[in-house]
Structure formats: structure tokens, C-alpha cells
Swiss-Prot record:
Required co-factors: FMN
Quaternary structure annotation from Swiss-Prot or TrEMBL: Homotetramer.
Disulfide bridge partners, by residue number: none
InterPro entries, A to Z: Flavoprotein-like_sf, FMN_Rdtase-like_dom, NAD(P)H-dep_reductase
Protein's name in the database: FMN-dependent NADPH-azoreductase
Protein keywords: Flavoprotein, FMN, NADP, Oxidoreductase
Gene3D superfamilies for the chain: 3.40.50.360
Protein's organism: Staphylococcus epidermidis (strain ATCC 12228 / FDA PCI 1200)
Enzyme kind, highest EC tier: oxidoreductase
Length: 188
């Protein structure tokens, strides 16, 4: 079983990244191979059908890599910071390079982090997009706050809150169950 976590934060070492790494560890306990595609480290340009933007080779390679990894994945997790009550623009740019073939009947987990007011609004917006791309957003979603994390001596963030650790377990169990049981495999 393979999964892809797409992190839509512009900040390297973000809270969304820390949550993604935590989930990758939990999925690993189920013998799931998970790759993290962090858009802060692998930028993608906005979609340009007119061809007026000259994308550098690195960005073109990032787009192709994202598309290939999404196609190979049995499930996806979309992670974003809360930007003005919605998901990030860089995640939107990345999603614009994907289509229904990348999502069709695949379970999709939704996660976000807020620095200010805790809000699940970005996840509600992503849920509509996942449905439009024929993906299946799992029922449990995770919306954390900066205060749910602590820092190691080297500054690395980690999920400290026990409640969210339990919620993460339910989230992971749902994704694994959807993939394992494949209730919609015949519709692909």
C-alpha cells in the first residue's frame, strides 16, 4: 500500500509538515509506504495553458514527480496551513496540475494547522475539491493549532497533544480501512 502526503505550506519545517511526519510514522506501523511531497521544498508554478510562464526545469520536474506519485498512490493526504480561512494558494497550484485520474475513488485524508483561531474551514473547502475530483474524503479530519506542538532542542516541531494523537490514530485507521477494503475499486 502506497500513500502520498502533499504539504501545502510555504514554510520549511512547518506545523503541517510536523503533523505529516507524525502521520507518516503512524501509517508506517500499518506497513504502509508513504512519501511526503512538501511544496515548500519542491515548488510548483501556477498552471499556465497559454505557455507565457517559462518554467525552469526543476519546477517542471517537480510537477511531473507530483503527478507520477499521485497516480501511483493508493491514497492521498492533503495538508495545508489555514490561510485567511481557507487552504493555501500553493496547494491550489499543485492541485491544478492534477486531475480526476489522480483522485478517482481514492481515499483522501485532510489535515490543517492554524496559527491563530483554530478552524476546520480549509478542510471543508478541500472536501469540495476532493469530491469534484472524484476522490473520497475520509470522515475524520485533523485541524490542529500551533499550541498542539512542542519543539525539540534543534527546533524541530512535533505533535505533543494527546487528543490529536488519538484522533490521528482514527484518521490513519480509516484511510487504511478504505484502501484495504476497496469498496469502490470496481468504479475506477
Amino acid at each position: 500500500m502506497k500513500g502520498l502526503i502533499i504539504i501545502g505550506s510555504a514554510q520549511v519545517g512547518s506545523h503541517t509538515n510536523a503533523l505529516s511526519k507524525y502521520l507518516k510514522g503512524q501509517l508506517g506501523e500499518h506497513d504502509v509506504e508513504v512519501e511526503i511531497f512538501d511544496l515548500a521544498e519542491k515548488p510548483i508554478h501556477q498552471l499556465d495553458f497559454a505557455g507565457t510562464t517559462q518554467a525552469v526545469d526543476e519546477i517542471k520536474n517537480n510537477v511531473k514527480s507530483l503527478q507520477n506519485k499521485a497516480m501511483e498512490a493508493d491514497f492521498l493526504i492533503l495538508g495545508t496551513p489555514n490561510y485567511h480561512g481557507s487552504f493555501s494558494g500553493i496547494l491550489k497550484n499543485a492541485l491544478d496540475h492534477l486531475n480526476m485520474d489522480h483522485f478517482k475513488m481514492k481515499p483522501v485524508g485532510l489535515i490543517c494547522n492554524s496559527g491563530g483561531i483554530v478552524s476546520s474551514e480549509p478542510l471543508s473547502h478541500l472536501r469540495v475539491i476532493v469530491r469534484s475530483l472524484l476522490g473520497i474524503a475520509v470522515p475524520t479530519q485533523i485541524a490542529t493549532h500551533d499550541s498542539d506542538y512542542a519543539k525539540l532542542e534543534d527546533g524541530t516541531l512535533y505533535l505533543e497533544d494527546n487528543e490529536f494523537q488519538l484522533r490521528s490514530k482514527l484518521f490513519v485507521d480509516q484511510i487504511v480501512s478504505f484502501v484495504t477494503n476497496s469498496p469502490y475499486e470496481h468504479l475506477k
